[in-house]
Amino acid sequence: MKDKFSFQKNYDFNLVSDGLYEIWNNAGFFKPKDKNNSFTAILPPPNLTGTLHIGHAFEVSITDQIMRFKKMQGFSINWIPGFDHAGIATQTKYEKIALKENQKYFDADDDKKSEMIMNWALNQSEIIKNQLKSLGVCLNWSETKFTLSEQANKIVNNCFKNLYENGFIYQAYTLVNWDTKLNTAISNIEVINKPVNQHLHYVVYKLANDSKQELIVATTRPETIFADVCLLVNPKDKRYTNFWNKLVVNPLTGKQIPVVTDSYVDIKFGTGILKCTPAHDFNDYEINTKYKFDFLSCIDSNGILNQNASKFQGLSVLQARNKIVKWLEKNKLLVKSIPLTSNVGFSERSGTVVEPMLSKQWFVDLPKLKDHLYLKKYPDFIPKRFNKQVSNWLNKLKPWCISRQLIWGHKIPVWFENNTGEIVVGEKPSKNLQNYTRSKDVLDTWFSSSLWPLICLNWEQDDSFHETELLVTGYDILFFWVLRMLFNSFFETKKLPFKTVLIHGLVRDEQNRKMSKSLNNGIDPVDLIRNYGADAVRLFLCSNHTPGDDLIFSEQKIKSAWNFLNKLWNVTKFVIQLENDQEISYDLDKLSLSETWILAKLDKVIQKITKLLDKFQLALANQILVKFVWDDFCNTFIEAIKKEPNQLKPQLFYTAKSVLSNIAILLSITVPFLSERIYQQFNNKSVMQATWPLATKIKIPKLFDLVLAAINDLRNYRKQYMLNSQQKLVVILSGKNAVDVKQYFNFSWIELKIETNKKVSFKYQIVDDTTQRLKSLQKQQAFFESEVKRSQAIVKNKSFLEKAPKEKVKSEFLKLEEYQKKLTETNQLIAKLTKAH
């Protein structure tokens, strides 16, 4: 697959990547070849609510690195892509668009609305697909899945039915997170807690049989007083011992409610008395499971106070709160109101305050399901510290609310008989369908997502389920998605859905802040690819993270990645120029010192990074490879080639292209586009057809390391004594190998002399003109003394310190510090030379 590509121009990532992805895809490189040696992974399906964000780019880049590595190791890879219909997120997104562009949507029936959303969603999936392709990921597009497809629906309905029939799905009237704007139950992950400035109101509850005695209760939600069922005090709080089991009067309804003792109450908060409103607070709801008081509700599904709120009925929560506070104050039932900042839950989708609301919903009994499954083995979580976190979550499981009052999603497969209330689950009734009404609710999008492995592997067609080898995902959805996948997949198949879960962190901005719309600090990977190319973006993402930890975004590091690729491009151009038509007999025993050294170094790198990749230490493997390419190959070997005799050039080209081809293979898992172009220059096939190189255990020649150390010492000497380009160092090489290595010392600033000395292998000596060196240093000394005096005069000038910009003042102090440092170093060198002289 020799590609006619020119390396003659400057590095242009657009030209480099142009057309390559289509070639790979059309050639079938992303499709599995052998079912018996497979390595399968599933793509966490991106939501169809927008374009890819930097977190997606991070996740798919590191997964692609693993998949390409496994392919080169001989595995038949199958990385299955797909998209999540994303329920509430997609519906609200489309409805915002429809407000501006499609008013007909709001007059349509539910089926027509779903059709409109579906058309928009499918268009979004094409946009996201093209963005993924621009990153060069080796996804098997022929197996693309969708969580709201007919195929997915069969699996979803079947799982719902099986869970229901086995007693793990039930319907209950209980407290849920309620979005009063969208009129639906929502999940915990869709509730965003934000600090809100509000007031803590101290309200009077008078004793029922003695109005002169009273209890003061602090609350931020006086509008829920209508639904109070009791007051709670801590039994350790001696202030209220006389009020135990007494009755107090609800200040808004006049009804009597008891005072109950419970150790849950925080003595230090407010007055140490808690009003219990189980229909409007999750903690109160849990407390009431012990006391079994009747539930009272005073807020309806639209966030409006209902008939239980007396004259405040019909007001919104905030309107009612303000008026109730004024009424309490007027009737001398309000002691005080003090400012307080506390967290309030907001709906991620509508932005409205979330109300705890009593509602009839469908639930999966996760605690019961966990006990039933009795999983003795779990996937390997990497890093291992997440095993403990998973274990903690498993011990704190609660029933999962899976019903939503939306249009977009899998309709809950439940039909109710209109007269008897009989329930048919899974498939529509086979007889008298007209006598049944189907549930209007849809399933939580996480329910269908929890069956993603089964959807990806076509479980409805073939129930011989095979677990996937790998899942790469973020820690932020470990509970909401991964554990639920584990439960539902194992329930259906009796097998784990994946062997290994590699966990990554979030991508944070350069100030280490979580990216969010409110901070306007999101990074668009498409813009980065447009500016730096996919290879540079991928190299940054794959080289600067630790498993399980957050990645700090740095555009400067992306620029550094681009600089590395530009360096590699130019070195490739140089190697290409070495090529000629002369045939050679390539003999490993007759290689030059530099050739043996670079091949041995390459061998060591192959060993190291293969071990690291096997352990999913991806970034560390990249860092080692980049260092080898930059320092050993480009800066050392390529520079050494330039000093080798011309008669060795044909052989040197062969060695250089061999090393460069191996670099292309090693680098291709992270930098696919440029690696492909480099590999094709020297091989008649794609890098995706290459096999991962094996280490051959070549020994690094010690002599060349000695040469490199000597050259490094000479450079440091010049720097230390501040020698300019005109001042040459006289260097004597001696030893039996001196003649063999002299070409490596061929620098314009070295005057080389060779002496015969067969007693040693190799040594060098600097013939130093101490007098000349002292003169040079004394000249530098005078300059630095002058600059120190000048700078000291400036920073002692009061006028300068008062009037000059802060940055200017800071800069001058830094200059002074630097000049003082250099003067000290120069003085030390002069003293050293004077003593030696």
From Swiss-Prot:
GO biological process: valyl-tRNA aminoacylation
Record-linked SUPFAM superfamilies: Anticodon-binding domain of a subclass of class I aminoacyl-tRNA synthetases, Nucleotidylyl transferase, tRNA-binding arm, ValRS/IleRS/LeuRS editing domain
Enzyme class: ligase
Motif 'KMSKS' region mapped to chain: 514-518
A matching Pfam family: tRNA-synt_1
Sequence motif: 'HIGH' region, positions: 46-56
UniProt feature coiled coil, ranges: 767-837
InterPro entries for the chain: aa-tRNA-synth_I_CS, aa-tRNA-synth_Ia, Anticodon_Ia_Val, M/V/L/I-tRNA-synth_anticd-bd, Rossmann-like_a/b/a_fold, tRNA-bd_arm, tRNAsynth_Ia_anticodon-bd, Val-tRNA_synth_C_sf
GO cellular component: cytosol
Entry keyword set: Aminoacyl-tRNA synthetase, ATP-binding, Coiled coil, Cytoplasm, Ligase, Nucleotide-binding, Protein biosynthesis
Superkingdom classification of source: Bacteria
Localization annotation: Cytoplasm
Molecular function in Gene Ontology: aminoacyl-tRNA deacylase activity; ATP binding; valine-tRNA ligase activity
Assembly: Monomer.
PANTHER family reported for this sequence: VALINE--TRNA LIGASE, CHLOROPLASTIC_MITOCHONDRIAL 2, VALYL-TRNA SYNTHETASES
Family affiliation: Belongs to the class-I aminoacyl-tRNA synthetase family. ValS type 1 subfamily.
Record comment regarding domains: ValRS has two distinct active sites: one for aminoacylation and one for editing. The misactivated threonine is translocated from the active site to the editing site. The C-terminal coiled-coil domain is crucial for aminoacylation activity.
Protein name: Valine--tRNA ligase
Source organism of the structure: Mycoplasma genitalium (strain ATCC 33530 / DSM 19775 / NCTC 10195 / G37) (Mycoplasmoides genitalium)
